[in-house]
Design a protein with these regions (language model features):
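Early extracytoplasmic/lumenal segment of secretory-pathway proteins
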Residues: 23-99, 109-110
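N-terminal signal peptide c-region/cleavage motif recognized by signal peptidases
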Residues: 18-20
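Ligand-binding pocket segment of bilobal, Venus flytrap-like solute-binding proteins
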Residues: 172-239
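Extracellular/periplasmic juxtamembrane helices and adjacent flexible linkers that interface
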Residues: 256-338
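A bilobed periplasmic-binding-protein/Venus flytrap-type ligand-binding module shared by bacterial periplasmic
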Residues: 120-129, 246-263, 280-284
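A conserved helix-loop-strand patch within extracytoplasmic ligand-binding domains
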Residues: 97-170
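Alpha-to-beta junction loops
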Residues: 79-85, 143-145, 207-215
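Bacterial N-terminal signal peptides that target proteins for export
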Residues: 1-9
Length: 338
């Protein structure tokens, strides 16, 4: 009788352990990323799954979604359950912190202001550069039509807007009326305002809209050198001066703690700082921080003087309130351009 009880207890304990292990293995975490990161995380995610299994002995599943980072942030605020964010706009993470979804000091939780990699705004032009586009000044010409995403929904496009603003701010020695007029002309020349970066790429490279696509340097190089639009023979233009675009990452604490995914989520974001992933990021033409990788890829990137928007325009709260909130300068300039 005692033997039967012991065996039954062992069987129950084994079943419980198996169930708990299975539950832990099957608990997925959700990464919400920006619109043009599909191919990048299509590589990173399976590499992390393998890495996690080697480190922990457990399986992990990653649920992945893509959209303009501002749209992603709004969806999360409205109840979308996401464990980590890998965005292209710091303010889109800040707004989640303000809503109590993650900690206020999220940018201190990982190196380099929680930005494993960075980029800048560059231009893509038609074969032979028929409009002779060299820099920001060319974007206000009457004969030039532009394509970039809507800054109201896309972090990518906010950097395009800020790149134009920061260039004009230097050009006109801070004369705000002249700066506004310059950026207003840029916006007036926009032929198509898709909600996200991928839509802008398709509009320009596939549908033939516009003379210049403004997007991240990484995307510009990927489009020009990739197979998808190879027949179009598109060309890269990197202006001499442009905006520093940091790509922030964060754990959505409220969700990760509720679902018990913090350990996996933290490891996933730390993984992006590893040498192997930093090398992978440069293959997608992102600029990175790992010293050995930076040295090995110096020739890959065009020289450009990067302006940190926070050093000129203040905090992201200030920038968002002044430029991108409803009724801000962006809305004013768009209304004037209609």
């Amino acid at each position: 009788m005692l033997k039967k009880i012991v065996l039954a207890s062992v069987a129950s304990a084994t079943l419980l352990t198996t169930s708990l292990t299975h539950a832990a293995a099957d608990t997925p975490f959700h990464n919400a990323s920006y619109d043009i990161a599909r191919e990048l995380f299509g590589e990173i995610n399976p590499l992390f799954v393998e890495h996690w299994k080697q480190q922990s002995g457990k399986e992990v599943k990653i649920i992945q979604s893509f959209a303009g980072s501002s749209r992603q942030a709004q969806d999360i605020i409205q109840g979308k359950k996401v464990d980590v964010v890998t965005f292209n706009q710091v303010s889109d993470v800040d707004i989640l912190a303000k809503r109590g979804l993650l900690r206020d000091d999220w940018a201190k939780q990982f190196p380099n202001n929680a930005s494993p990699y960075y980029s800048t705004t560059a231009f893509l032009v038609r074969e032979g550069n028929p409009k002779n586009i060299k820099g920001w000044d060319d974007l206000i010409r009457d004969d030039v039509k532009l394509v970039f995403p809507n800054p109201k929904t896309s972090g990518n496009a906010r950097y395009s807007y800020l790149g134009a603003w920061l260039f004009a701010n230097e050009k006109f020695n801070g004369d705000q009326e002249k700066v506004k007029a310059f950026v207003g002309k840029v916006l007036k020349n926009v032929e198509n305002f898709p909600t996200g970066g991928r839509g802008a790429t398709v509009a320009f490279a596939q549908n033939g809209q516009g003379d210049v696509l403004l997007t991240f340097e990484s995307e510009v190089i990927n489009i020009a050198n990739g197979d998808e639009f190879k027949s179009a023979n598109l060309q890269i233009v990197v202006p001499e001066v442009s905006v520093l675009a940091e790509f922030p990452v964060a754990i959505v604490d409220k969700v990760a703690d509720e679902r018990g995914t913090r350990e996996q989520a933290k490891a996933f974001l730390e993984f992006q700082y590893s040498k192997d992933i930093q090398q992978l990021l440069t293959r997608y033409n992102y600029r990175v921080h790992h010293p050995e990788v930076v040295e090995a890829t110096k020739a890959q990137f065009a020289p450009v003087r990067l302006i940190n928007p926070n050093e000129v325009l203040g905090s992201w709260d200030d920038i968002t309130a002044k430029h991108f909130d409803n009724g801000g300068i962006l809305d004013q300039l768009l209304a004037e351009g209609r």
